[in-house]
């Protein structure tokens, strides 16, 4: 056991424990050893590293996350000792070998993940094993339940509704219409959403343009009691913490294993107390799911898992072959959603159609509309301003103020991208549009993004504006323009594709 003086490191490496190389040599420890750092009864597990210059002898360097968990400050004395190897490592290897895991083995993996006993390398091995070997529904059910149980569980009375999209399509701001439509019909819909992970704007990023999203459970219950709905950031709550841990290793690997996709969605809904759920599965070129067949298979798995969890779930397969609406980026999307709530006849058809279709399904699930008539009721609530009024109630209850679409500010710098030829828009790349919007600064720069002047099938002439890039940074705008010229995300083709001559 070593007694060392704390030195706080301003770095974001959660498992790092740094000591002087001479201290390491004179101890029984080796680089990459798993150690327990202890202070006044609190313990954190870390991976040991050494340095000859960054840390003096007798010191221990700890990153901010570890400092916060231990409750230490600069100069405090902590102890380090050898940590036992995680019990779940053999189970991770078992899944790497392609074998089925028992419920208890899955519980151990999730527990040790949440307790900080697994390193990112070990978690990456587990995530990769799921990507390669998958899981059956018994395993997925066990993983979902444990992911929910390791965090906060919210209890409600009566039916609690929610809608969730698996994502992958830019501009998917449907929740800002669906939540107030459903809430205005008297159904309770506490919507928790994520911030952007790989997109230009998550639902929470868009709503945050208008109001607070970092509400506590107590605040959420108050808002829902007052308004029937809310739109908040799930990351501010301790819901299914293992989900956020796995996402952090999925992102750099660029993978999204289906077992984790299913568990991620359902664990958070289970933890939030949802018992009536609609899953949106965008499908098409450039979406996560490419075909109706693939989407139907995923939908059946969501429904089977939901049945096991006693959550009544329906799935909607929606068109995801191009962005939803015309706006991509937090402020631009908030502005477009508000416009749809103010006067839906002036808003993009794709946004309105998707929103009232999804809301209609929820209204039918809630028994406030007969089967087949939910969409009509949803459109009526939108047209009569009921959804707009309810949206403003929710925004104010969450700490914001009433605002109109023309009051939303977007980036002060902008650039129009023009069509190089006459023709028709034959394809819009979801990935390309997202990359350009992010290069412009979205989602961190809430005023950055893209506004599409055209959609697939539109006729254009040479020189017409295809889309406009917005940013609050002149440099970021220039960078986005350069990327736009490389990616060419909107494809325009003439009716004559090629001429074949006799010779």
From Swiss-Prot:
What molecular function does GO assign, one term? Answer: 1,4-alpha-oligoglucan phosphorylase activity
Gene Ontology cellular-component terms listed: cytosol
Q: Which residues form a coiled coil?
A: none
Q: What is its EC number?
A: 2.4.2.57
Q: Which first-to-last residue range defines the signal peptide?
A: none
Which SMART domains does the record cross-reference, listed alphabetically? Answer: PYNP_C (SM00941)
At the top level of its lineage, which domain of life is listed?
Archaea
> What does the UniProt keyword field contain?
Glycosyltransferase, Transferase
UniProt-annotated binding residues for AMP: 168, 194-199, 203, 264, 288
Which of the seven top EC classes does this enzyme belong to? transferase
Sorted alphabetically, the Gene Ontology BP terms of this entry are: AMP catabolic process; pyrimidine deoxyribonucleoside metabolic process; pyrimidine nucleobase metabolic process
- Look up keyword Transferase and say if it applies: yes
Q: Which reaction does it catalyse?
A: AMP + phosphate = alpha-D-ribose 1,5-bisphosphate + adenine; CMP + phosphate = cytosine + alpha-D-ribose 1,5-bisphosphate; UMP + phosphate = alpha-D-ribose 1,5-bisphosphate + uracil
A Pfam family name for this chain? Answer: Glycos_transf_3
User: What are the positions of the active site?
Assistant: 256
Concerning InterPro entries, the annotation shows: AMP_phosphorylase, Glycosyl_Trfase_fam3, Glycosyl_Trfase_fam3_N_dom, Glycosyl_Trfase_fam3_N_dom_sf, Nuc_phospho_transferase, PYNP-like_C_sf, PYNP_C, Pyrmidine_PPase_CS
State what this protein does: Catalyzes the conversion of AMP and phosphate to adenine and ribose 1,5-bisphosphate (R15P). Exhibits phosphorylase activity toward CMP and UMP in addition to AMP. Functions in an archaeal AMP degradation pathway, together with R15P isomerase and RubisCO.
Member of which family? Belongs to the thymidine/pyrimidine-nucleoside phosphorylase family. Type 2 subfamily.
Q: What protein does this entry describe? A: AMP phosphorylase
Query: What species is this protein from?
Result: Methanocaldococcus jannaschii (strain ATCC 43067 / DSM 2661 / JAL-1 / JCM 10045 / NBRC 100440)
Q: What does the record give as the organism's lineage?
A: Archaea, Methanobacteriati, Methanobacteriota, Methanomada group, Methanococci
């Amino acid at each position: 056991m070593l007694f060392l003086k704390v030195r706080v490191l301003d770095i974001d490496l959660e498992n790092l424990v740094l000591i002087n190389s001479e201290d390491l040599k004179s101890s029984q420890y080796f680089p990459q050893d798993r150690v327990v750092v202890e202070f006044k009864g609190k313990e954190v597990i870390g991976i040991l590293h050494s340095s000859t210059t960054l840390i003096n002898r007798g010191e221990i360097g700890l990153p901010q996350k570890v400092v916060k968990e231990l409750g230490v400050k600069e100069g405090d004395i902590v102890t380090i000792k050898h940590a036992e190897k995680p019990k779940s490592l053999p189970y991770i290897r078992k899944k790497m070998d392609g074998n089925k895991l028992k419920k208890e083995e899955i519980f151990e993996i999730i527990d040790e993940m949440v307790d900080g006993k697994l390193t990112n390398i070990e978690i990456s091995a587990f995530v990769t094993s799921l990507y390669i070997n998958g899981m059956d529904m018994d395993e997925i059910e066990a993983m979902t339940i444990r992911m929910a149980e390791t965090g906060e569980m919210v209890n409600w009375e009566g039916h609690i509704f929610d809608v969730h999209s698996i994502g992958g399509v830019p501009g998917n701001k449907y929740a800002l219409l669906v939540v107030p439509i459903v809430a205005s019909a008297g159904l309770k819909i506490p919507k928790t959403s994520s911030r952007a992970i790989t997109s230009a704007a998550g639902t929470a990023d868009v709503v945050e343009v208008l109001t607070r999203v970092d509400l506590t459970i107590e605040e959420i219950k108050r808002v829902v009691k007052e308004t029937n709905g809310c739109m908040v950031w799930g990351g501010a709550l301790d819901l299914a913490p293992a989900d956020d841990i796995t996402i952090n290793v999925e992102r750099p690997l660029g993978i999204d294993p289906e077992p984790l996709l299913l568990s991620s969605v359902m664990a958070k809904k289970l933890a939030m107390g949802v018992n009536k759920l609609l899953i949106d599965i965008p499908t098409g070129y450039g979406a996560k799911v490419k075909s109706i067949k693939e989407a139907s298979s995923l939908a059946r798995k969501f429904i089977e898992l939901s049945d096991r969890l006693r959550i009544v779930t329906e799935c909607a397969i929606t068109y995801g072959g191009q962005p939803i609406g015309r706006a991509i980026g937090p402020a631009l999307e908030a502005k477009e959603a508000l416009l749809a709530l103010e006067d839906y006849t002036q808003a993009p058809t794709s946004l309105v159609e998707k929103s009232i279709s999804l809301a209609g399904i929820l209204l039918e699930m809630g028994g406030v509309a007969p089967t087949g008539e939910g969409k009509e009721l949803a459109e009526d609530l939108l047209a009569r301003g009921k959804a707009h009024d309810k949206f403003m109630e929710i925004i104010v209850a969450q700490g914001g103020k009433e605002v109109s679409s023309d009051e939303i500010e977007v980036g002060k710098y902008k650039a129009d991208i023009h069509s190089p030829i006459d023709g028709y828009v034959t394809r819009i790349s979801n990935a390309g549009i997202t990359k350009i919007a992010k290069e412009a600064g979205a989602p961190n720069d809430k005023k950055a993004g893209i506004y599409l002047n055209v959609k697939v099938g539109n006729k254009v002439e040479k020189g017409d504006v295809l889309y406009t890039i917005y940013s609050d940074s002149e440099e970021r705008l220039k960078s986005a323009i350069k990327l736009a010229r490389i990616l060419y995300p909107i494809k325009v083709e003439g009716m004559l594709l090629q001429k074949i001559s006799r010779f």
